[in-house]
Amino acid sequence: MPRTVFCQYEQRDAEGLDFVPYPGELGQRIFNNIGKQAWAAWLAHQTMLINENRLSPRTPEHRAFLEGELVKFLFEKDAQKPAGFTPEA
């Protein structure tokens, strides 16, 4: 039986993640409060940020930026698309 959490992103009960997806306290917060669909939405948003801003997850400054955007996206509903972003038709 899947684990259920109240997803703070979707503001409803949702299927929980199967594992802690991120290290540390933030990872535990995500595991306890974010559902699978919301996490998948973050991964898609993160990919867009990496591609549009030409970020490298290996660079500490870029990792810090992505972590800040992760918190904004999942918990603060304040994430924005990169400047000049236009989705493919």
UniProtKB/Swiss-Prot annotation:
Q: Which HAMAP family match?
A: Fe_traffic_YggX
Per the record, the similarity remark reads: Belongs to the Fe(2+)-trafficking protein family.
Q: Which UniProt keywords apply?
A: Iron
The molecule here is called Probable Fe(2+)-trafficking protein
User: Which InterPro entries does the annotation name?
Assistant: Fe_traffick_prot_YggX, Fe_traffick_prot_YggX_sf
Can you supply one Gene Ontology CC term for this chain's record?
A: cytosol
Q: Which GO terms describe its molecular function?
A: iron ion binding
Pfam hit, one: Iron_traffic
A GO BP annotation: cellular response to oxidative stress
